[in-house]
């Protein structure tokens, strides 16, 4: 159910290098957990990203779905240098490790190792919604599976200008969007569409994705630390 999210800007938006995003996670509008992502800088000046997600879907006190995901990324020169993730989805374990060298990338999952040359992948990106130039990417790596997917982005009307049950809203100019409640980008993959929301200042503040018919997963920023 959640795998699709992780498959889940050329704006002047780039968070400071000591930020924490604390998201409430909702399924069909009901809280099911959280996802906290912390950005810092190491002694080499590389950006370090660490995150932890925990979702639990319950009915009458019984847990029907449990999901835990931990991830750590290191970025340098606007490219992903290394990544390690561990995911438990209803008890099923998935792990991904990515390292880089002058020759290229080495990608390892529980299924198989894979080498990627610089000709094949000169600069890898994960689903790093918070990074400047995110919406200019044309391929992203799923941090849960290691799968590479072609992607495209479409700028949508600002968040408040696109209410539910309303008719079509004219596409705003960049200036109008800057003065409004924020930006929305539609991220499209081969099998999924994710709506990603940003504040007027370009801060990532949430996302929304249809996991299945009548199942909508939402990230809502609780606070920025």
Describe the predicted segments one by one.
Residues 1, 17-19:
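Absolute protein N-terminus
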Residues 29, 175-177, 202:
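Glycine-centered positions within short beta-strands or beta-hairpins
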Residues 10-15:
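N-terminal signal peptide c-region/cleavage motif recognized by signal peptidases
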């Amino acid at each position: 159910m959640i795998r699709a999210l992780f498959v889940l800007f050329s704006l002047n938006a780039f968070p400071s290098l000591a930020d924490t995003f604390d998201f409430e996670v909702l399924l069909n509008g009901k809280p099911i957990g959280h996802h906290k992502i912390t950005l810092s800088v190491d002694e080499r000046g590389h950006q370090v990203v660490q995150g932890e997600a925990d979702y639990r879907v319950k009915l009458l006190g019984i847990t029907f779905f449990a999901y835990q995901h931990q991830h750590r990324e290191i970025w340098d020169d606007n490219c992903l240098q290394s990544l390690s993730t561990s995911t438990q989805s209803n008890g099923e374990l998935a792990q991904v490790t990515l390292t880089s060298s002058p020759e290229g990338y080495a990608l390892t999952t529980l299924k198989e190792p894979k080498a990627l040359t610089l000709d094949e992948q000169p600069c890898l990106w994960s689903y790093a919604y918070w990074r400047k130039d995110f919406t200019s990417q044309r391929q992203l790596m799923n941090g849960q599976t290691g799968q590479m997917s072609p992607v495209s982005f479409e700028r949508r009307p600002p968040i408040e200008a696109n209410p539910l049950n309303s008719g079509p809203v004219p596409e705003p100019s960049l200036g109008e969007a800057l003065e409004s409640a924020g930006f929305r980008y539609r991220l499209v993959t081969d099998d999924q569409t994710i709506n990603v929301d940003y504040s007027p200042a370009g801060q990532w503040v949430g996302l929304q994705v249809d996991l299945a018919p009548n199942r909508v997963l939402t990230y809502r920023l609780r606070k920025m630390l």
